[in-house]
Curated annotation (Swiss-Prot):
GO terms for cellular component: cytoplasm. This is Probable molybdenum cofactor guanylyltransferase. Keywords: Cytoplasm, GTP-binding, Magnesium, Metal-binding, Molybdenum cofactor biosynthesis, Nucleotide-binding, Transferase. It comes from the Bacteria.
Length: 202
């Protein structure tokens, strides 16, 4: 099973590439790698990024989005990796701007996916907050690839356009007994400031 860290975004609102922003003196992407390695669930952790950022990562497994899918968002990153490793049974996807993802959350979601995989033939299992899916913290089956291809080819780059067409199910974030910042994504510098304050006050 492989993990995909999505790190190819423009980070315009944040003002700099979020992958290299730091929390507790550690870049976001390195903290996520440490968490994923700590689960002992993945045979490979792949960073999906763009050509501009690729050389800046201190990591050996990097896949660059294809030229025709440049600037097409998370879907392009997911597609780049799944099509490269299509024989893999399952992929865990996490956005690099979710730096406080926890081992507990990844393990719990995997259990949820496996429990529903055979009976419900799930293609995507992710988290939801107040009923709203969070498709950038989710497990994806390679069966999603044709739907991802279709979405990219039709210029509909939304993850929703994929998860609405396949069998998906979502685990409520409240079932993870951790401070709620574990699933929060960082869009602005003030989000990072707030997160650091929350960690200090924990």
């Amino acid at each position: 099973m492989k993990a995909i860290i999505l790190a190819g975004g423009q980070s315009e609102r944040f003002g700099e590439p979020k992958a290299f922003a730091q929390i507790n003196a550690q870049p976001f992407y390195k903290r996520i790698i440490d968490v994923l390695e700590g689960t002992n669930m993945f045979n490979q952790i792949i960073i999906s990024t763009n050509e501009t950022l690729a050389s800046q990562f201190d990591h050996s497994d990097i896949i660059i989005d294809e030229d025709q899918n440049k600037d097409k968002g998370p879907l392009a990153g997911i597609q780049s990796v799944i099509q490269h490793y299509e024989s893999e049974e399952l992929f865990f996807v996490v956005s690099v701007d979710t730096p406080m993802i926890s081992q507990k959350a990844v393990s719990k979601l995997y259990q949820f996916m496996v429990e529903h995989l055979i009976e419900d033939q799930l293609d995507i299992a992710g988290f939801k907050e107040k009923g709203r899916p969070i498709p950038t913290i989710a497990f994806y089956s390679p069966h999603t690839l044709p739907y991802i291809d279709d979405a990219l080819n039709s210029n509909d780059y939304s993850l929703k356009s994929v998860y609405n067409k396949v069998k998906s199910d979502w685990l409520d974030v409240n079932l993870i007994e951790s401070p709620d910042y574990w699933y929060k994504n960082i869009n602005y510098q003030q989000d990072l400031d707030s997160l650091q304050q929350d960690i200090l006050n924990r």
